[in-house]
Swiss-Prot record:
GO molecular function terms listed in the Swiss-Prot or TrEMBL record: manganese ion binding; RNA binding; RNA-DNA hybrid ribonuclease activity
Classification via SUPFAM superfamilies: Ribonuclease H-like
Positions annotated to bind a divalent metal cation: 28-29, 120
Protein's recorded name: Ribonuclease HII
UniProt main location, coarse: cytoplasm
Top-tier EC class: hydrolase
The species this protein was found in: Caldicellulosiruptor bescii (strain ATCC BAA-1888 / DSM 6725 / KCTC 15123 / Z-1320)
RNase H type-2 domain location: 22-206
């Protein structure tokens, strides 16, 4: 019997459940690339009996669909956690280390201990849990896809919320990404306190 797309997304988790793993955690990040704002990470343990239809890599979903799925994932999850690392720390330790730190914090803040962690991309250094890295995991793993939605929506909401503090920069429109408009604003006004200075060296004379 051919699996549906939703069932295919759970194939990795199904194999792990059959191997005896109970609490399977997916973890993913949002906001590696922007010129401003924190990097976010989410960790989530989903319930096998409550598969949510339509879960995909967050980048393939409309904002409206992401928002709807965000609420469903929170409601149906066994446990979830969201963490962020701000722009100052990103500048201090670099974006790769900041991303790993956000992921590690999200996992460690879960209300339960996962039996195994599925990571999108590469293994998290010094993580005290069994983990498997899955390249393009947000396209292959249901748990990672759920985490990608939680991370993306959480970051977008945060950026929209703080945008009122920095009205000149129009963060609510571009979410901190390096759009033409954002770069023109940067060249006119310079960076604000939430910009990642280490990301701006090729854009501004810093």
């Amino acid at each position: 019997m051919r699996l549906s797309e939703d069932e295919n997304y759970f194939e990795i988790e199904e194999k792990l459940l059959n191997e005896g793993y109970r609490f399977i955690c997916g973890v993913d990040e949002a906001g590696r690339g922007p010129l401003a704002g924190p990097v976010f990470a989410a960790a989530v343990v989903m319930d096998r009996k409550r598969i949510i239809e339509g879960v995909r890599d967050s980048k393939k979903l409309t904002p409206k669909k992401r928002e709807k799925l965000f609420e469903e994932i929170i409601k149906e999850s066994i446990a979830y956690s969201v963490a962020m690392v701000d722009s100052k720390v990103i500048d201090e330790i670099n974006i790769n280390n900041a991303t790993f730190l956000a992921m590690k914090n999200a996992i460690e803040n879960l209300k339960i201990e996962p039996d195994i962690v599925l990571v999108d991309g590469y293994k998290i250094p010094n993580l005290g849990f069994n983990q498997r890295a899955i390249i393009k995991g947000d396209r292959k793993s249901y748990s990672i896809a759920c985490a990608s939605i939680l991370a993306k929506v959480s970051r977008d909401r945060y950026i929209v919320e703080i945008s009122s503090k920095y009205p000149l920069y129009k963060f609510e429109k571009h979410k901190g990404y390096g759009t033409k408009e954002h770069i023109e604003i940067l060249q006119k006004y310079g960076p604000c306190e939430i910009h990642r200075i280490s990301f701006l060296k090729n854009i501004l004379s810093l």
